[in-house]
Every structure is written in C-alpha cells, then in structure tokens.
Amino acid sequence: MTQTLSQLENSGAFIERHIGPDAAQQQEMLNAVGAQSLNALTGQIVPKDIQLATPPQVGAPATEYAALAELKAIASRNKRFTSYIGMGYTAVQLPPVILRNMLENPGWYTAYTPYQPEVSQGRLEALLNFQQVTLDLTGLDMASASLLDEATAAAEAMAMAKRVSKLKNANRFFVASDVHPQTLDVVRTRAETFGFEVIVDDAQKVLDHQDVFGVLLQQVGTTGEIHDYTALISELKSRKIVVSVAADIMALVLLTAPGKQGADIVFGSAQRFGVPMGYGGPHAAFFAAKDEYKRSMPGRIIGVSKDAAGNTALRMAMQTREQHIRREKANSNICTSQVLLANIASLYAVYHGPVGLKRIANRIHRLTDILAAGLQQKGLKLRHAHYFDTLCVEVADKAGVLARAEAAEINLRSDILNAVGITLDETTTRENVMQLFSVLLGDNHGLDIDTLDKDVAHDSRSIQPAMLRDDEILTHPVFNRYHSETEMMRYMHSLERKDLALNQAMIPLGSCTMKLNAAAEMIPITWPEFAELHPFCPPEQAEGYQQMIAQLADWLVKLTGYDAVCMQPNSGAQGEYAGLLAIRHYHESRNEGHRDICLIPASAHGTNPASAHMAGMQVVVVACDKNGNIDLADLRAKAEQAGDNLSCIMVTYPSTHGVYEETIREVCEVVHQFGGQVYLDGANMNAQVGITSPGFIGADVSHLNLHKTFCIPHGGGGPGMGPIGVKAHLAPFVPGHSVVQIEGMLTRQGAVSAAPFGSASILPISWMYIRMMGAEGLKKASQVAILNANYIASRLQDAFPVLYTGRDGRVAHECILDIRPLKEETGISELDIAKRLIDYGFHAPTMSFPVAGTLMVEPTESESKVELDRFIDAMLAIRSEIDQVKAGVWPLEDNPLVNAPHIQSELVAEWAHPYSREVAVFPAGVADKYWPTVKRLDDVYGDRNLFCSCVPISEYQ
C-alpha cells in the first residue's frame, strides 16, 4: 500500500523514541497482564468517573528537528543586551570542559539524589568539594550541599536563627536595608507564615530595636558598598542575637570571611562560579553555619564515613533532620536542591583553583577601579567609596544615560534614586569599560584604559584594609591539581564512572519518575538566547522567554484542568509551599484566616507535612484502610472535628501506594463540604496526563514536578521546577514578585523564589517534551507507564507480593513490593535486596516509603521490555538467593545479599565466603558490568563521626 506524504513525514516519530517498548513489546506485555489493549488496560484501572472523554488539546506532535526549529525562532525574540544590572546575577564564562563533560553529559544530569551512596560516590565527591569551597570562603565549620537560590537561603537562615536562638520570647527578625530586594521579598513571605515581624532598617540602627532574635546583613550591599560589620557583629553576639550574612561568592575570594568576623550563618548564590544567568535560574545557593548549629541546618549535607571494609566513603549525613524522616518536624521542606548547579560551581573552583579564582576576582575588581577612576576624573560622584565589582553612580541626566545605554544594547540598574548601578563580571572587557565611559560621559571623554590602570594599580583604596582576606583558600590538593584540560577531563570522567545514571541502567525509584531526558529536550538550555538573559532585564528584551513560558503554561493548564499556572516555584517542595500559601491567602480574603488545619493521609510524602508546617498550618493525619486507601470514615471524622478551622487536604493521586483510589472524588467533596480546599500533589502526574486531570477530579491546586512528569532531569538531586496550577478563585493568591511583575497573573502576594519565573532556563525542556509528544503521545506515555508497572507487578507477584492493588488486582504506574514476610522468614531485609541489586547493575527502588519494609518500583514509560525483563530477572535471581539463605546453604551472616555490594578489590583479596567470587560480582554476567567503588556504607559511623569537608587525597586512591 502506498503511504501518504503525511505518513512519510511522521510527525510523531519522537513518541516512538521516548516510549521504550515498541508496539510488539507492548502487545507481549499486554498479553502477560491479561489486557487486550492500552485503552482496555486503562479502562480497567482508572475509575470511570474521572476518565477524560477526549485528551487535552495541546496540539499534534512535532519531530525533534521541527520542534527545535520552532523553539529557536521563539528564542531569537530574546534580545541579548550586555547586562550590568547585578543584584545577585552576573554573566559568566562556563569553562567548555565543564560544559561538554558535565552539563551536556547524561552521566551527570540523569542521576538521582544520592540516597544510595554506593552508586553515587562521584557526585558526592563533587558535592563535598562544593562544601569545602563554602567552608574556605565563609570561614565557618559546617556547609550544606546547596539550597535552591540565595533568597530562599535567606529565608532558611531566618528559620534556622529562630530554631537556635536562646531568646525564646523574641519574635522579630531584622533585615539590613541594603539586601537585594528579591531576598527581602522571599524573607517577608516566609516570615508571615511563621508569625515573625520583619524590621527593615539601616544596619547600624539594629541595636535600636528590641525583641530581635536574628539579623540579616549583606557583606556587599545591593548597590555595591562593602561593609565591615566586625564591631556590629560582636555587639550583636553579646546580646545573643543570631547573625546571618549574605555574601557574594566571587567577592569572598578577596574579602575577609564573615565567619571570622563572628557571623553564625553565611549564605549566598554560587551562580557566578560558572552557571549562566538563565533568566533567573537554576542556580545553587551555598549555606554555612557554626558547628554548634549543625543539627539545625537546612538541606542536604555530605559527610565522610566508612564502608563495610573500612574504606573512606561519602554519604548524605544527618538525614534525620530532613523531611523524608522528620516530616512536619523537619528543619526544612527541601527535597530537590540544586546538585547539578552546585557541582558546576564546585568543578569551576577545581578547574581554576585558588590562583585562578584570585586572578578572576582581581581582574573584575581592577576593571571596576578603572571605571570608577575614569568616572570620578570626569566629575561623576560615586555613592560608595568601598566596593568590589559594583558602582552606584550619581547622574544628573539619568534618562539620557539610560537612553544611551539602551542604544548601545546595555542594561544598567535603573531602580536607584538619582543614580544608576553598574556591576562588572568575569566577561567584562576593556572594550566594555570604554563603552560604559561613552554611555555615562559621552563619546568625547578622552579616557585611556592603560593610563587609568597605572593610576589605580598602586593606589586602590576601594577595599578597606580590614576587609582584605589574609588567609589562604582552597589549599586541598583537589583544587590545585586539575588545571590542564586533559587532567580536568579525566578527573570528571573518574567521578562519573563511580555513579549509576540513566545512561547505564533504568532507575526504578517509586515516586520519582526517572524517565528519559531526551537530547533534543536538553539542547536548548545552552543556547545563549536562553542562557544569557538577566532575570530583571526589561520585559521587551525577553519576549522569547515570555512566549515560551506562556505556551508552556497554556499547555499545562489544559493538561491539569486548572485555570491558571504560576511558574515561580523552583522545586516541588516550593510548589507545595506556594500552593498552600495560595489557600491560606484565599481563606484570609474571605475573613476565614482561622482556617489552619491541613489534613494529610498517613501515606503522604514527607514534604507534604513539612510544607504545611512552613505555611503556618497544623497537620492532622488521616488514616489509611487495610487496602492502603484513604479511610473515608476517618477523613469525615477529622473534617468534622476541624470544622470551621479546616483549611485543606493534601492528597497524592494516584496514591503513594500505587493505586487509583476509587473514592478520590468523594474525598474532594467531603473537604469542600466543610469549607476546605483540595491540594492534589502532582508527584504522580505521570499516571494522569491525558487520562484524567487534577482539575477534572475536583482539586483546587496542584504543583507539577517538571523534573518528573515533564522530563527535566534530576541532575543528581536538582534542579527541579514545581509550578502550581490553580482554579480561578485561587489565581489572585499565587506568588508575585517585587522586582518584576508577572504578566497575565499580577498579584500582590510575596515571592517564594528569587526570580519571577523560578528556574526559567530549564523550562524549554518541558516545552520541547510536550511539543514533540503532542496530545496523542502524552496520553500514550501515561498508558505505557501503567503497562510497564503492571507487567513488573504481575511477573514478580509470586516472588515478592505486591502490597496494594486497585480494581481487578491492578496497580497504577508504580507498585510496592512487600519484603516484610521474607524478612521475618529469612532475616534478609529490603536494604539487603537494594544493595544486592547494585551487583546486578541496578539502582535500587525506593526503600521503606511509603511503608517500612517495602520496595516501591516505578519503571516509567521510557524503559523497553528488554530492560524491564533484565530488572525482573535480577529480582527473581535475588529471590532464589534468599531461598538459598532460607535453606541454610548460605548463613544469614555471610551471603551475597548481606555482603552486597561487592567491589573489584574483593576479586583479588583472600576469599573466605561460602559463595564464589563469580556469584558475588557477576550474578548477571560480565557484559556491561557496573562496578561500585565502595561497599555498604556505615551510616552510624558517619553520623557519630561527622566530617563534612575534603579528606586527604590519599583517601580516594
């Protein structure tokens, strides 16, 4: 039969690239699970009353090439002016060796958060290096492995200050008046829900205020002034006030460490260590504190520990502080942070080393001195005598200066009264400085760079002597060894080799959706049209971004059944927080601000109660029945008990138990009956897209994990994006922004992230995914995700019972394998199975969530039947090994499971185990063998002997 031109053009080609099983494999799996077709399987599993009659109208699919061309045309609408706006964002030079070998390398960007340290030693080492950079530059004792951005780090510092404060009756937080405005915006938002009063004043007036538990200072103020706060900090400490300091990471290379001046907490953005501005993100924040406060710190902390053989190994330390364990009592709701961006900054420091960083910082400062000297020679006045890279220049004809700047395609900071701000960076050249002279002085200024350089080289007073750093930084060998590109390339490859990512095997983590991050989706994030825009540039320079974001928001509205989408939250946890704030402010607008009870099912993800606590709500847990579903009787009882104080329920759908609950609409109706709102967590949206939607189900607000459902990679623990979809009545209450107003959704609400559109530069990934899949492909992706999960469940059911199933014994897009009976019978635990899977070449499923003693498996639609069978075969082989233990062939204390994982050095060591070396290391054969570099971690040792900085290089050898 002759094909039509449309068939030959094959606009849906990407659908077959994204979905792992081909048509024949899908049919084999359908036969195995007893279903005739994908539609028939979906009809059996998803409750009839919530199935969409037609898929959301997001358009037909496009080929990779057509979608890239379309997006390139949109991106070209952005105008790439040279931005000197500053305010915490500068242009950078990302070393090509890091761009090619890390940012564009799936071995780095497709990995998951390093909960399984044995398969994560490479990125853990890079994160430990990031912590060492933070410690050296801040002068403090403990550092985290990144927070979401500088503004949220400030909010976390405020919350931490209250936790550690000895002034228990104090309830006021003081913010110096020259912090960045976006920082103040986010701090005010967080303070409102915590019930703190924020005082904003000149830093020197802080002592005039009473009942202050914490203070936020900025070492280099938002308009450029360097502050020596040594004496002030000393006085504040004498009054037991916790002092936080925001710092510029590049300025810290030259300036004295705030920790040496007495600061308790120091934080800032690591963006200018090689991470493009990207219209606001993603960027990693650094965060450090005194040792005595370590158990009150937010976010991930990487620590040095030992493995079972006594070898040095790295792990995430002190996890009992975090939301997945402590829930509403956690220090923070942080789940996804900014690992990929922290690692870029880490490797930037490794590549340049202390000498290179000092050269870069000194060059920036020298050019700033030259600019300052020339302007002063011509009679212009600088508002500050002490500066690093930012000048606040008073101008009589401000409108004329800004007009000349625009004509020269230059952005200056324009929001300062009777002055302009100019921030230089590592990309600034002599030619740029001469151009700035022309903009500020006119073309006939007559200034010469070399002459000015001689003048300032021997007489620079722009940094106070007391503020000059007098100690060495980055003395560890890792920062002094890899400065040639060859050495750097090999070092990065050595780290990558230690880790297990999607470029080697499926990562079947339940509730994580580790699907394909296609190359075509990733390509646009490095386009300069997207990468080089300042988040506070004039909106007419970002028309491409605005068009792309508007299209993506429109598609998400259609896919979710909501009326509006806010793109600001830069992680799923931030999305939860933003959605709950919208609910809170909605109730307040109706004079029902007393509604503060949040109902949360016992099965919920730990971020849910942590976010509810952050939003100022009381958490009341709703029981689940024996089938894992929300207990409707208990829900109704708790809702009645809450009465007029009921704010909302947070529910995940399909449930975290891997089931489409039949009563989800009734759950929504009960909560609405008592005046509450329904927050539907979007963590499992990959089982909804095209089949049903939160808005159609009856929810009022959801966050969407774009780094799950919509293909943004996990990056080893970030970046993420968590935009929220809302019904119309909540739209006026989504986050706003004090610097940039969000067109189409102007609100007076405070911000939750530093940038108005969060991590805007990764939104093209989700745009590309939806554009290439179209309505047809998106629905099919959800259906195949469901098929893959049911195929695994059906094949493993006899060996590992599936804990919860829905109608007809089916699961949704993930399934929970119950290991508890086996553990009781044999002594082998879910942990042993997880570690043994490493020997078979797999990352473990999610352990002990949402039920202790279980493994939760989510294969996604991207894995082929071949890979699913390989995983199933590994699990069945492990079950046979457990049977060997049960039969007494291998003792419980010495078998391949309890000793897993096995490493290369064991092959040549003395062997005293009752099983062979081959059984130990080659259980799945020798082809494509993944070798972990450490044995099972000793978690107890790591937390009892907490060490969170770089160890001697010999320990890695």
Curated annotation (Swiss-Prot):
> Species lineage, top-down?
Bacteria, Pseudomonadati, Pseudomonadota, Gammaproteobacteria, Enterobacterales
Which top EC class applies here?
oxidoreductase
- Which SUPFAM superfamilies does this UniProt record tie to the protein? PLP-dependent transferases
Family to which this protein belongs: Belongs to the GcvP family.
Tell me what organism the protein belongs to.
Escherichia coli O7:K1 (strain IAI39 / ExPEC)
Gene Ontology biological-process annotations: glycine decarboxylation via glycine cleavage system
- Write the protein's name: Glycine dehydrogenase (decarboxylating)
For this protein, the record's InterPro entries field holds: GcvP, GDC-P_C, GDC-P_N, GDC_P, PyrdxlP-dep_Trfase, PyrdxlP-dep_Trfase_major, PyrdxlP-dep_Trfase_small
Q: In terms of domain of life, where is this protein from?
A: Bacteria
List, separated by semicolons, the cofactors it needs. Answer: pyridoxal 5'-phosphate
Positions carrying N6-(pyridoxal phosphate)lysine are K708
Keyword terms: Oxidoreductase, Pyridoxal phosphate
